[in-house]
Amino acid sequence: TAPASHAQNLPAAEGTCALPAHVADTELPAPDPQLAQLLRFATGAGVRVAVIDTGVAPNPQLRRLIPGVDLVDPESPDPFFDCDSHGTVVAGVIAGASRGVAPDAEILSIRQTSMRARQPGPQGDAGSLQTLADAVHFALDQRARVINVSVVSCLPPRLAGRVDMGPIRAALARAEAEGALVVSAAGNASESCEPGYTVVPAHEPTVLAVGARDGDHSIAAYSMPVPGPFVSAPGLVEAALASDGSGWASGTAGRPGRKDAVQPYLGTSFAAPAVSGAAALLIQRYPHLSPAQLRALIHAAAQPGGAAVDPLAAVAQLPPATVAPRQPAVTIEPARESAAPARWLRLV
């Protein structure tokens, strides 16, 4: 698996961490005016959101950051180490104090993959579908109600039928049964992830898949298509939490050969957490919502055309008793001896 950020699909020297391109407070764009209206309904208080990603670095903007587990480096675990400058950005979209959708939500950091500081686990499987399943189980053990997955595995048709999907489907079925909504990035189109490929977990029936849209509200060209219902959110984060401990960043700096370049935080990775934040608000208002009801409410609040999620419309909807969602069928496939090994996840 790898993060679903358009910017992070770039090679980096092993052990070289991404450098946030800092932005002064005076240079920040104005916050979304809708955020103030959202907070009149809910703030995410009491809702735990698991961020399965590259780790989440502490930042003063993350007031309720909880250490989870480090599946990348189990010998020297640090779920707060974000070498990729990815998971921290995701967490900030969800629960940043000034600009997050659900600023009072708890963030549970689960470090599951890294493109820059990968240190294989005992089985050499850090960042695999197996550790993704393990991460979901850990999130459920820690009572997360929303699980944000901005890392995906993109399987070409020739491999999709050979990969053992049993463990991840079992984890997703448990999440559905225990009342946790799984939100996933739809994935970014690239040479290694083309339309027609299977994107895991975004293409699973109980997962709320989120595509990215551009500033004009159209679906971004890089956003992978989803075979079933989906929603969309902005794919660009102009004011992100810096992963080096404080302040804001507009992207990562210091790409090889272009040290002065700034690669923006752009991709379906950063669209998914906006929806996870909206889900946290809904759960605070209606704690007994099932994942199926949450999906139905969020879909109902999406605007026609590009399925753009309107968090304010979602949170201000009528009580969920008026919602009658269709329950997706979930089939757990047993492991097969001929199954191919799980593919690495990618940052999207």
Predicted feature descriptions by range:
Residues 38, 75-81, 120-126, 158-166, ...:
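Second-shell loop/turn segments in exported
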Residues 148, 286-348:
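C-terminal subdomain of the subtilisin-like protease fold in secreted/lumenal serine endopeptidases
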Residues 54-58, 71-72, 113-117, 152-157, ...:
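Solvent-exposed loop/turn segments at secondary-structure junctions
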Residues 2-46, 60-61:
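Protease zymogen maturation seam
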Residues 45-49, 103-107, 141-147, 177-182, ...:
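Loop/turn elements at helix/coil->beta-strand transitions in domains of secreted/extracellular proteins
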Residues 53, 202-284:
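Extracellular S/T/G-rich loop segment that most often corresponds to the catalytic His/Ser-adjacent loop
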Residues 37-49, 54-67, 77-128, 225-228, ...:
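Subtilisin-like serine protease catalytic core
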Residues 116-200, 265-266, 270:
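Substrate-binding/access-modulating region of protease and related hydrolase catalytic domains
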